[in-house]
Regions:
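Flexible helix-coil linker/hinge segments at domain or subdomain boundaries
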Residues: 80, 98-157, 163-185
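Modules that initiate DNA replication and primer synthesis
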Residues: 61, 73, 90-103, 142-149, ...
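Residue-level preference for alpha-helix termini and adjacent loops
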Residues: 46, 50, 136-143, 222
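Extended hydrophobic/Leu-rich segments
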Residues: 7, 12-16, 35, 170-173, ...
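Generic recognition of flexible, low-complexity loop/linker segments
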Residues: 39-40, 81, 126-127, 226-231, ...
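Short, conserved alpha-helical segments within structured domains
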Residues: 87-91, 132-136, 237
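Signature for HUH/AEP ssDNA processing cores
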Residues: 1-89, 95-118, 212-216, 232-235
């Protein structure tokens, strides 16, 4: 599905309603202040949240639900502002904070959350390591997840969850997700996350050996720089394949 820039709430609702139940519908994790005719302007990103993706890669939703509830104990104890969603195959947790202009600050806070979860449940957990990408997408609430299905082959919906839902087991969540869940949208908690200042990047001594390559494909310099990182974004990978 092609991306579309919408600037008004009504246009957004019309687009989502037209595509829902036909295809997967996504929107950006982060908001942007400015847009060109066909795309967002990356430099105008509003960095005011961290997106935590608990992904059931092996269809182990019980594991993902366990991890969400562990992290939510910390969130509720600190009264962080949050929203929580079941995506159809995992869970999306947003923690909202004071705006920062350095994505590394968000990544530093994420590492604190990750260390907390590892301390509680161990290294075998469902929290996705990819965080802090301004191009990251997330599923639109109350749209169908075409990659999911119940025992009868019916897909689940991405639905909002509230604090009271944390007492349910995963079967209770799946029952809720069998249809859209139209409840008033509101954030839980009252305290904004204060993203810690990331430590300065220090030079590392020594040399890095570059592996020999066989042949050379013509590639735009900007695309080469985008994919030659430790964890390329989804968009850069897609551009590489299409190139």
């Amino acid at each position: 599905m092609k991306r579309k820039v919408v600037l008004a709430r009504n246009d957004y609702a019309k687009f989502v309603n037209a595509q829902n139940n036909r295809t997967n519908v996504y929107t950006t994790v982060y908001d942007f202040e400015h847009f060109s005719e066909k795309a967002k302007i990356e430099s105008s990103v509003i960095i005011d949240r961290v997106f935590l993706d608990f992904d059931a890669h092996t269809d182990n939703l019980d594991l993902a639900w366990r991890d969400v509830k562990q992290v939510m104990e910390l969130v509720l104890s600190r009264q962080y502002k949050y929203t929580l969603f079941f995506s159809g195959r995992g869970f999306h947790l947003f923690l909202f904070g004071k705006r920062t202009h350095n994505m590394r600050n968000v990544q530093t806070f994420f590492r604190e959350i990750k260390e907390y979860l590892v301390h509680k449940v161990g290294k075998s957990n469902s929290l996705d390591e990819r965080v802090g990408q301004t191009t990251r997408l997330r599923r639109v609430p109350n749209t169908v997840n075409m990659s999911s299905s119940d025992d009868n082959g019916n897909p689940y919906y991405c639905i909002p969850l509230i604090e009271n839902d944390l007492s349910k087991n995963i079967e209770g969540i799946l029952t809720l997700a069998s249809r859209p869940r139209h409840i008033p949208f509101e954030k839980g908690g009252k305290n904004e996350v204060v993203f810690p200042d990331a430590p300065p990047i220090e030079a590392i001594g020594g040399e890095v050996s570059v592996p020999n390559t066989v042949g050379k494909l013509p590639m735009l310099p900007c695309l080469h720089n985008a994919v030659m990182t430790e964890n390329p974004s989804h968009m850069s990978r897609a551009y590489l394949v299409s190139w």
